[in-house]
Structures are given as structure tokens and as C-alpha cells.
């Protein structure tokens, strides 16, 4: 801080990404946003009323429990919860489920429909509990651009008409 003559602080990488998005990117000027990274794990940053959410720990949204897809018999890889979002939808979870790295499965629609089911379920939980103006998705798994329309459709399906807002059109 002394060397740079600017305020300095430490936080998680995903909170840094979220701050970048609300300062300069996809959520510029928003007061309530969530950034989720899905890659080797699942991390999340939450901005609520213009402040990063901190409590006893940083938000562990990657460890929210998931209801398994009716056609998915995979038990999950999380050593603590097995079927949490990270255990079901992270890159290592996909590799354990299919025996191949996620980026080699791009042409198999069922893989991405299942992935969208879990991510969509998590987003519904986040929408209903935190009410963000925007949710930003990042991380290696999200490089599969076919996921975005599948996730959007899954969120609408799982919300089942409960919420109707313009923000849901721009998840």
C-alpha cells in the first residue's frame, strides 16, 4: 500500500473477477451480481447492495446440494458432499463421469444437457435466494458456448413460471 500509494486488500480470485465485472465489464454499475466460475472447481463471488458478501467464510456456492438428473446415475466427486454443484458439474466431475476431459466432449449433446441441468439448478437457487440483477458465468467449462442457451432454457424450465422479470432474459 505504501509503495503504490493506493488502497490494497486481499480477497478471493472470483471476488476479484466479480469486482472487475461490476467496475468495467458485463455488470458495470450493478449493485447486486453474482460471478460463478466453473472449471477445476466451482467458486462464486456475491455482490449484495454494492458490497462483497463476506461472513464467517466467503460464499461456498459451489457446495450447494444438487438433485440428480433423472438420467444421471453419477454420484459426484466432492469428498465432502459428493453431489454438490462442484461434485457434479466441475471439469473433474465431468471427466470422472465420462472418462474424458470436458473439452473433448463438445459434440455430444447429452453431456451438455446434463451439465446445463446442474448449472441451471444452481442458478435457480441463487436467483431465488440472492435475487441478483445479473449472474456472470466463467471458468474453463464455460468455454463451451453451446452451454449458454441450454442453461438459459433450463433456468426457465426449473423456475416453471414462478418469476417473470426482464432480468431473466439476460442471465
Q: Where are the language model's segments positioned?
A:
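Phosphate-binding/catalytic loop of phosphoryl-transfer enzymes
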Residues: 1-79
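ATP-binding/phosphotransfer module of carbohydrate and carboxylate kinases, centering on a glycine-rich
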Residues: 2-6, 20-30, 68-171
Amino acid at each position: 500500500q505504501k509503495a503504490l500509494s493506493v488502497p490494497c486488500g486481499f480477497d478471493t480470485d472470483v471476488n476479484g473477477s466479480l469486482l472487475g465485472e461490476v467496475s468495467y465489464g458485463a455488470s458495470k454499475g450493478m449493485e447486486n451480481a453474482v460471478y460463478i466460475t466453473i472449471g477445476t472447481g466451482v467458486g462464486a463471488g456475491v455482490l449484495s447492495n454494492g458490497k462483497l458478501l463476506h461472513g464467517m467464510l466467503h460464499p461456498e456456492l459451489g457446495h450447494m446440494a444438487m438433485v440428480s438428473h433423472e438420467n444421471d446415475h453419477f454420484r459426484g466427486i466432492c469428498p465432502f458432499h459428493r453431489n454438490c454443484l462442484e461434485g457434479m458439474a466441475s471439469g473433474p466431475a465431468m471427466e470422472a463421469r465420462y472418462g474424458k476431459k470436458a473439452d473433448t466432449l463438445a459434440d455430444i449433446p447429452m453431456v451438455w444437457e446434463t451439465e446445463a441441468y446442474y448449472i441451471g439448478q444452481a442458478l435457480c437457487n441463487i436467483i431465488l435466494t440472492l435475487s441478483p440483477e445479473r449472474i456472470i458465468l466463467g471458468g474453463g467449462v464455460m468455454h463451451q458456448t453451446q452451454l449458454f442457451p441450454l442453461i438459459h432454457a433450463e433456468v426457465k424450465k426449473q423456475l416453471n413460471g414462478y418469476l417473470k422479470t426482464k432480468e431473466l432474459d439476460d442471465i
